[in-house]
Regions:
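Iron-sulfur cluster-binding electron-transfer modules in prokaryotic oxidoreductases
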Residues: 1-211
Length: 211
């Protein structure tokens, strides 16, 4: 089931309200059990955490609010767990520099800071917050013919030039799928999600460790 973000962005609020109700019904048992509901896409998290409670009414709104309280971004959960001493990741040394591009919804929810803190735990890597504003794609905005030039112009302000001039041995991290598409479409650079980068750096057990 879709989070409803595309419907909300297009102003199709009646259909978005139906999605919010369905998602609330499906996710509420997890929230009631105090289980974190982990999202990898900031716009999806925003739809569940911020928009769904406002779209539904009555008792359903109370359940949606409970779901929202247990909805977390991947970077947020891992950094919180690490900082609290409840778990760590055995990371090998990573790229010399990690360029971080925050998704617009990630910024609006104040979740760039935990992403930067988590990436800063990669050994020997320097994390640079590009603070580049919107990538220009804005969900489906940049995919339409009428918005193509505006979308590119927004990206060319900071993000796309930064991608083209990345130092050797560095990597561009972006949690938003639309952001990654925008970067690749205009520069050929393949930005990666934080989870994918961390997965690639997990120290693999040796044969002796497995014995």
């Amino acid at each position: 089931m879709c989070c409803g973000r595309p419907l909300i962005s297009q102003g199709l609020l009646d259909e978005a309200r139906r999605h919010a109700a369905l998602n609330t019904d499906r996710l509420h048992p997890l929230a009631r059990a105090e289980t974190p509901i982990v999202f990898f896409e900031p716009s999806c998290l925003s739809a569940i955490r911020e928009d769904a409670p406002a779209l539904v009414r009555g008792e359903l709104r109370q359940r949606a609010q409970q779901v929202a309280r247990h909805a977390v971004l991947f970077e947020e959960l891992v950094e919180e767990t690490w900082a609290a001493g409840r778990g760590t990741l055995p990371l090998a040394p990573g790229p010399s520099a990690i360029l971080l591009h925050g998704h617009c919804h990630q910024k609006s929810m104040g979740l760039v800071a935990p992403a930067k803190a988590l990436l800063s735990r990669v050994p020997q890597a320097r994390v640079v917050d590009l603070d580049a504003g919107c990538c220009g794609m804005a969900g489906s905005f940049g995919y339409t013919r009428d918005h193509f030039e505006v979308s590119q112009a927004i990206g060319e302000r900071r993000l796309l030039p930064a991608a083209r001039t990345m130092p050797a041995g560095s990597v561009l991290v972006a949690s938003g799928m639309s952001c990654r598409h925008q970067v690749h479409d205009f520069t050929g650079v393949r930005a990666v999600h934080t989870a994918k980068l961390l997965s690639s750096l997990l120290a693999r057990p040796s044969a002796g460790d497995q014995a």
